[in-house]
Amino acid sequence: MTNALTVGSRREKRRTAAAAARRRARSARPPWEEPPTAVGQAAKGLTLGGTLAVILVPLWIIVLTSFSTPGAINRAGGLVLWPDGLTTETYRQMLSDPTVVTALGVSLGITLVGTALSMAVSILCAYGLSRPRSLGHRFVLLLLIVTMFISGGLIPSFLVVTGLGGYDQYWALILPSAVSVFNILVLRAFYQETSAELIDAARMDGAGDWRILWSVVLPTSRAVTAVTALFYAVGYWNSFFNVMLYMPTDSQKWPLQYVLLTYVNRANGLPGSVNSGFGETHAQTAPLSLQMAVVVLTLVPLVIVYPFVQKHLRTGVLTGAIKG
């Protein structure tokens, strides 16, 4: 009997000690590491569900409206929430216009060439500024930072580009926005955190700066490089303001964004439309379906490219924000 009481007492003491240890562990953890309560889990689910709805519902409406007939759009009151009278007429008419096909090729060319040029300049500049013994790197860095807060202005930029013969030339759509100081600073911050042991080992093996950049720095910075390239590519793909400044007359040189903007203006009865075959036939389609088709057409390339860089996006953004 005494042995049974002793064993039971020991078990109770162990339970009490374990409970006290759990309480101490919980009290030592920060609040954000505490297991969520039922109310917290419900609030998290509602927040995530609401955020997802805010993102997906507009996309759903845009896609359905772009495929809807004028009657379906009128019955829905302007924006289609459920499939009704779907048609691809708007897309057929838009893609049958040679202006759109040419503009798509122009946009792809500008995006590819511009992104390659911007990445080359940004990587070289960031690597040079990241080396502490680079000649004049502090002065160059100061000049770059100043340009983030003080710009020359629209009219001086226009006069410089046109004075260099850039009016109605493709390079005028690339060079004025070829370099982003923010992207250079992000790359520089990452390059500064590259292992000094790796660089020293490469120098001992006889590698110069070009070899170190190509064989050591770039392979260890794929994430931030992919994110920076994505930022540049999206900027070139969505750009249309420079077209309004430097290439406003020749529609055969317009990129896709500006051509589609003129189609939206035509659908709304605004001036500045493209003089092409699409203009005479689009009256058979709903203007709103045309505008939604414009949005879908401009999103498709980004949706195709994003999965290839998605795995690097989170790592690259956080790395550029934390390091340095």
Q: How would you describe each model-predicted region?
A:
Residues 2-324:
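A hydrophobic, multi-pass inner-membrane permease signature
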